[in-house]
């Protein structure tokens, strides 16, 4: 858990919430429409430092407040997301760590595990730059293996049940990137694909 890890590291340095540190914690609860309001509230709070977990949260917060120092984590590609112009030497108010995975290797692993699968389903939120970057790579690798990518997009967790059901019927195997909407609805995806007897490989440990 990114938040817990951050707090644990602060504690190691002698900073503890409620003693010599105050932490304002807000959670979108899987609904990205809440991010703008949350970012506005954090800006009003005039914090010394903000931590954004995941690409959509970091983008929303930086758009609202480009001055307060911001750390980000669980961001796949900070440059493509517009958070920094240079990942080696960040030149904005933001810096942090990425959770970028080797998408090509994961697709090749999927193919090795399920060699008879010819149609590979790809489920993601097209509004998440982190997902778009991974899907672009996934499609390229899938095609290079002589397979067919089957794309389906979701905007919120409410879309997942119906979309995943249609997705499962059209796919022999499925791949889900480090996508926040999909991660929040992974139980639903698991139930749908299990029922359809379609294997799933995910980039997110969730």
Model-identified regions with their sequence ranges:
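Short hydrophobic alpha-helices and adjacent helix-cap/hinge residues
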Residues: 1-206
